[in-house]
C-alpha cells in the first residue's frame, strides 16, 4: 500500500511538472510571436557567439557566380556592418543566404522583379511573415560552424555500423525480462547494463557531438520545410512548390531521425528522450543511419537550404526597408552593346562597346549614418570628385557604391529616386600596407587597380569603379604622372568616380 501511495505521488508530481513544462512552452511561443511582430523593421542582431561570424561565409563560398563582390570592395564599403545592420534572420540558412545575396549582385531583370514581389508581399502580409519566422526560429542556428563545415568532414567518419548498439539494447531488455523471473539477479543485471550503456554512450556521443548537432539541424530544416509547405500564398507558390517536390526525397532521413534525433532537449519530452537515448543509444543508431542518408541527399539538402535561406533572408531585407527613413525601388536597365565603332563615345570593356550608360540618384544617403546629408548625382561619364578635407567625399563615394550594390541585391536604394544601368561594382579606397608579404602601400594599390582593369576586359556588365585618392603617399611628381595614366586607362575601359 505504501509503495502504491509513493508511486502515485511520484506519478502526480511528474504529471504536474510535465503540464507546467507544456504551459511554459506555450507562453514562450506566444511571447516569441509577439517579439517577432515588434522587431520587424528594427536593426539586426548585435550579439554573436565567439566565432559565429566565421561560418556565415560558407554558403557564399559554396555557391560561386561569374561576378561577386570581392574582399577589397566588401571591406572598403564596410559591408560587414551593413550585413549586421540588416541581419534580422531567424536561422543559419537565412543569415548565410543573406550574406551571399549581398555579395552576389544580379544582372537579370526577371530575378530582381521576382525578388521585388516577394519583398512587397513579406512586408505587407504580417500574419504569413510571422508564421514563417516562427518556423525559421524553430529551425534555428548551427552555432559556431556552418552546416557546410560539418558536411565537408562527413568522410572523416567513414562507415559506421549499428551492431554493437543493437546488442547492448538486446542485453538491456533481456535483463529487464530477467528481473521478472529473479528480481535480485535481474535488477543487478539491469544496473550493470545501464552503467555500461551510459558509459559507452557518453564516450561515443562525445566523438559524434559536432555531427549530431548538424544532423539535428538538418532534421529541423526538414521539419521546418514540412511546415512551410502547408502555407498557401500565391506569391510564395514558386518557392514552396519546390519544397513540396523535395520533401519525398527525405523519407529515409525522417525514418532515421525518428529513432531519437530530437530537435531539442529543453522541453519536457526532450528531457525524457535524453534519458532514453542514454539507455538505448537511439540517437547514435539514428545518427549512423542518417549519416548514410545525408551522404546520398547532399544536393537536395543544399537545395532546401537555398529555398529556406532565401525566404528568411528576404524577410530580413523587407525589415531593413521598413527601418529606412526613405527608400525607393531602383529602375535598372541593361547596357546596350553596339558594334565596333558604331556609336560615338561608347565605353569599351572586354571588346564590348556599351552606350546609353547612366547613373542617377536623387537624395542619396548612407544607411549607417544617424543624421546623413543627402546628395544627388547624375552622370553618363566618369566623374572626378574634388573638395576640401572632411567635406564628405569618401562618404559620398561609399554611399553611391553601396546603393548600387543594394539596388542589384535587395532591389532597394537609400534614396528618393534611382535610375541606372546594371554595374559590376569595384572599389579601391581603404587599402593598407601588406606587412605579411612585404608589399608597400604603393604595390598594394597598383595590384588593386590592376584587378579593376582586368575585370573591365572580362565579359559581363560594365564596371563601375570607385577610387579614392589615387596613389596617396607617393611623391607629388610621380603621383601626378602615374595617376594621369591610371585615370586615362580607367576612362578608356569603364565609367569611374
Predicted features and spans:
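Alpha-helical bundle segments enriched in helix-capping/polar residues
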Residues: 1-381
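ATPase nucleotide-binding head domains, primarily ABC-like/P-loop NTPase cores
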Residues: 317, 324-495
Amino acid at each position: 500500500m505504501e509503495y502504491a501511495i509513493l508511486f502515485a505521488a511520484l506519478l502526480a508530481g511528474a504529471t504536474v511538472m510535465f503540464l507546467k513544462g507544456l504551459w511554459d512552452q506555450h507562453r514562450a511561443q506566444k511571447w516569441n510571436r509577439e517579439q517577432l511582430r515588434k522587431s520587424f523593421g528594427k536593426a539586426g542582431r548585435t550579439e554573436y557567439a565567439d566565432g559565429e561570424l566565421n561560418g556565415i561565409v560558407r554558403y557564399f563560398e559554396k555557391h560561386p557566380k561569374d561576378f561577386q563582390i570581392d574582399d577589397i570592395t566588401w571591406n572598403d564599403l564596410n559591408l560587414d556592418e551593413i550585413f549586421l545592420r540588416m541581419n534580422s534572420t531567424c536561422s543559419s540558412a537565412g543569415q548565410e543566404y543573406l550574406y551571399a545575396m549581398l555579395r552576389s549582385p544580379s544582372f537579370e531583370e526577371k530575378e530582381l522583379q521576382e525578388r521585388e514581389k516577394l519583398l512587397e508581399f513579406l512586408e505587407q502580409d504580417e500574419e504569413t511573415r510571422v508564421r514563417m519566422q516562427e518556423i525559421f526560429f524553430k529551425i534555428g542556428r548551427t552555432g559556431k560552424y556552418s552546416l557546410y563545415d560539418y558536411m565537408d568532414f562527413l568522410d572523416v567518419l567513414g562507415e559506421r555500423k549499428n551492431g554493437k548498439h543493437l546488442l547492448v539494447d538486446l542485453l538491456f531488455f533481456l535483463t529487464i525480462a530477467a528481473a521478472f523471473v529473479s528480481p535480485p539477479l535481474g535488477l543487478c543485471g539491469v544496473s550493470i547494463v545501464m552503467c555500461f550503456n551510459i558509459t559507452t554512450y557518453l564516450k561515443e556521443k562525445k566523438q559524434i557531438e559536432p555531427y549530431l548537432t548538424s544532423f539535428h539541424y538538418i532534421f529541423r530544416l526538414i521539419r521546418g520545410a514540412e511546415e512551410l509547405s502547408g502555407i498557401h500564398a500565391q506569391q510564395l507558390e514558386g518557392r514552396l512548390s519546390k519544397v513540396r517536390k523535395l520533401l519525398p526525397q527525405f523519407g529515409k532521413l525522417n525514418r532515421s531521425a525518428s529513432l531519437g534525433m530530437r530537435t531539442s532537449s529543453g522541453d519536457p519530452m526532450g528531457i525524457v528522450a535524453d534519458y532514453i537515448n542514454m539507455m538505448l543509444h537511439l540517437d547514435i543508431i539514428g545518427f549512423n543511419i542518417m549519416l548514410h542518408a545525408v551522404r546520398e541527399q547532399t544536393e537536395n539538402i543544399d537545395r532546401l537550404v537555398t529555398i529556406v535561406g532565401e525566404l528568411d533572408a528576404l524577410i530580413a531585407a523587407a525589415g531593413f526597408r521598413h527601418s529606412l527613413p526613405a527608400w525607393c525601388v531602383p529602375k535598372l536597365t541593361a547596357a546596350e552593346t553596339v558594334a565596333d565603332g558604331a556609336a560615338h563615345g561608347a565605353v569599351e570593356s572586354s571588346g564590348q562597346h556599351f552606350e546609353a550608360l547612366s547613373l542617377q540618384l536623387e537624395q542619396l544617403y548612407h544607411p549607417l549614418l544617424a543624421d546623413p546629408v543627402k546628395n544627388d548625382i547624375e552622370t553618363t561619364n566618369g566623374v572626378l570628385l574634388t573638395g576640401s578635407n572632411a567635406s564628405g567625399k569618401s562618404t559620398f563615394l561609399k554611399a553611391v557604391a553601396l546603393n548600387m550594390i543594394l539596388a542589384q541585391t535587395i532591389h532597394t536604394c537609400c534614396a528618393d529616386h534611382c535610375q541606372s544601368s546594371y554595374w559590376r561594382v569595384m572599389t579601391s579606397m581603404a587599402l593598407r600596407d601588406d606587412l605579411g608579404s612585404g608589399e608597400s602601400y604603393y604595390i598594394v594599390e597598383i595590384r588593386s587597380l590592376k584587378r579593376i582593369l582586368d575585370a573591365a576586359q572580362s565579359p559581363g556588365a560594365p564596371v563601375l569603379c570607385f577610387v579614392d585618392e589615387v596613389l596617396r603617399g607617393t611623391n607629388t611628381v610621380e603621383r601626378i604622372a602615374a595617376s594621369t595614366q591610371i585615370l586615362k586607362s580607367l576612362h578608356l575601359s569603364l565609367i569611374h568616380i
